[in-house]
């Protein structure tokens, strides 16, 4: 605490022995020890009361929990990167007017309609039937 070594304590003891004398030195050491003990207890009581009033333990627990949650989030983000835009989930955009046409189609007359060859409609071989559910309807 005060970084006092053995030699310093020995020097203080010798000075106290010379000043107080051999008769009063044991009583002075005992009284000093009692006062130091009382001061330590009162400081620890004051510290505990202040911490209890301001809720330092609760604040420390909350900060600790927040740190743990932040670390957990960081670990999850490092393991699993944020989901990128899934091209299968987004509907395909309709082709632009000039995207599927050849270069010479731009010189055609405006009344001509040209269907793009890139996306021809698929012929349907099945007849269209309304969707039926095999599950019984709920009352």
Curated annotation (Swiss-Prot):
Residue ranges, compositional bias (Pro residues): 80-95
GO biological process, one term: protein transport by the Tat complex
InterPro entries given in the database record: TatA/B/E, TatB
Purpose of the protein: Part of the twin-arginine translocation (Tat) system that transports large folded proteins containing a characteristic twin-arginine motif in their signal peptide across membranes. Together with TatC, TatB is part of a receptor directly interacting with Tat signal peptides. TatB may form an oligomeric binding site that transiently accommodates folded Tat precursor proteins before their translocation.
Localization, UniProt: Cell inner membrane
Membrane topology, as annotated: Single-pass membrane protein
An example Gene Ontology CC term for this record: TAT protein transport complex
Keyword Protein transport: yes
Subunit structure: The Tat system comprises two distinct complexes: a TatABC complex, containing multiple copies of TatA, TatB and TatC subunits, and a separate TatA complex, containing only TatA subunits. Substrates initially bind to the TatABC complex, which probably triggers association of the separate TatA complex to form the active translocon.
Region annotated Disordered, chain positions: 69-139
Gene: tatB
Pfam families listed in its UniProt record: TatA_B_E (PF02416)
Protein name from the UniProt record: Sec-independent protein translocase protein TatB
NCBIfam families linked to this entry: tatB
Family to which the UniProt record says this protein belongs: Belongs to the TatB family.
Source species of the chain: Stutzerimonas stutzeri (strain A1501)
């Amino acid at each position: 605490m005060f970084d006092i070594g053995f030699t310093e304590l020995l020097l203080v003891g010798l000075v106290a022995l010379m000043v107080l004398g051999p008769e009063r030195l044991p009583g002075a050491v005992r009284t000093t020890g009692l006062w130091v003990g009382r001061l330590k207890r009162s400081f620890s009581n004051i510290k505990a009361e202040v911490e209890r009033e301001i809720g330092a333990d609760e604040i420390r627990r909350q900060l600790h929990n927040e740190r743990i949650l932040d670390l957990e989030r960081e670990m999850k983000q490092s393991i699993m990167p944020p989901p990128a835009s899934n091209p299968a989930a987004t509907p395909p955009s309709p082709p632009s007017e000039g995207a599927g046409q050849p270069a010479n189609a731009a010189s055609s007359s405006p009344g001509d309609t040209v269907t793009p060859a890139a996306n021809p409609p698929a012929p349907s071989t099945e007849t269209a039937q309304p969707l039926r559910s095999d599950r019984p309807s709920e009352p």
